[in-house]
Amino acid sequence: YMRNLFVLVLLAITLGCNCAPLKRGSQDDFRAMRDSMVNTFQQGMLQHDTSLVMQSWRMSENLLQVDKTHKENIYHHRAVVMAWLGRKKEAIENRWLEIQCMTDSNPDKLVYMAKKYTIENKKDSAHYYISKLLEFCDSNKDKHYNDQKSHEGYMAYLKLIAISLNEGPAKGKEFLDKQLKKDPGNDLYKYLKDNWKDFLKYLNDKT
């Protein structure tokens, strides 16, 4: 399911922590704490050890008190922890807190809000964020990056989400098929085609 991919993406960009509470400290201290937080969760996840996962959760609580510059990443981590534990309500709550820390132009925020309002059948609000997401794709598609192929694939992925939400899954599938014809070796496109039902579940999941 796409949540597996979601968890991997979250882990890749989440920064980690140490359990001892601090009233003040350097950025190096906070970085070490964040690293410890993530490492503890990964260890608990791999060993299926709930006590380690909850230890990572407690680390995140300490970090929220002292590290004021990485709240987005910390809430991100907390959402992953709750999702892994199967506590969906708390996962959604922490995901929402993470979203509120993002800038309005952040594509993750645009995707989340577009999905949220589509699920809630708030058509005007959904259309607004879908339009913003499409604008983001159009304004960034011609920018040049070191890994141009990955950038183009990411822009196509965001556009696939927007089209699927706005025009329906059938139109989204047509768009994906066109992208595959252009780039048949693209691993992301092939994954999405092979796991299309999971992608549709992802579109209807607020986490």
What are these regions (language model features)?
Residues C17-E61, Q65-V66, N73:
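N-terminal leader/linker segments that initiate helical-solenoid repeat arrays
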Residues V38, Q42-M45, V80, K115, ...:
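Residue-level recognition of tetratricopeptide repeat
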Residues D35, H77, Y112, Y154-I161, ...:
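"A position-specific structural signal for the A-helix of alpha-solenoid helical repeats
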Residues L5-T14:
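Sec-dependent N-terminal signal peptides
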Residues L158, L165-T207:
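Terminal, low-structured helical/coil segments at or just beyond the last alpha-helical repeat
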Residues L22-S26, S60-N73, I99-D104, F136-S150:
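Flexible helix-coil transition and linker loops at the boundaries of alpha-helical arrays
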Residues M45-M59, A83-N94, K123-F136, G168:
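Helix-turn-helix repeat elements of alpha-solenoid scaffolds
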